[in-house]
Amino acid sequence: MDIIDYHSHLPWSRGSNTFDASALLRDMDDNSIALRMVSALKAATVSEGNTTVLNLAGRHPDRILASAVIDPRQPDVVAYLTALLSEGIFRAIELDPMEFNFFPSEMDALDEVFDLCGQYGVVVNVFTGWGSRTMPAQWTDLVDRHPTTDLVYLHMGGPDFGYGCVDLIQPSNRIYAETSGLYELPVLRRAFASLPPERFLFGSGYPTKISACSIEVFDSLELTAAQRQALFRDNAAALLKL
């Protein structure tokens, strides 16, 4: 099966301030990943990282899906996001409360950010799973206020909030669970037993996670062929209208 990897980052060297797109593409080849959503969470600046991802997606439109990292603390965030989305390349944005040290409830620009994503048909990916700033429940009010915007919980609540994340996704048809970095089989078993199969998106977490391990963990769950097809390909294709 040709996999769609919903979550990865572009490798970056702080010492040389360079990105390693070749390593990312080789990893895709090694793991039968046909399409990969990529963001540049680590970069000298947010703008430089996003521009690099934009250019990478332009060079490899059949392999790379672009996700823009957004820092909602910045005073020009709405204008900046408007300019990015008007390029027509970015399929998603990534909001990381741990990386940028914020609580969603304190960021008054987020309503406009969600509005813009809804207007452009762009998905909002949010980092969850490690510490109080990354609680999945902090995003539910924004989802309720913006009924045209889809939300993805990256790492599916992680080690801190995995069980609670399942409960938050259950009543909504606009919240999805992305799987990278979550290897706790009891949480995964509960999630697959409780949630509709179309709510799951496979993510590798590359390069901080090993792509093969992110794929092989699902061998332990004894998923049906239809569940695997949905997880590894069909759900991302439907969400992103590929």
Predicted regions located by residue number:
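Alpha-helical scaffold segments that flank or form the walls of functional sites
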Residues: 18-39, 51-59, 82-86
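Mid-to-C-terminal alpha-helical segments outside catalytic/metal-binding sites
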Residues: 1-6, 18-35, 197-199, 212-242
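Divalent metal-dependent hydrolysis catalytic cores, especially in the metallo-beta-lactamase
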Residues: 8-9, 22-44, 64-71, 91-92, ...
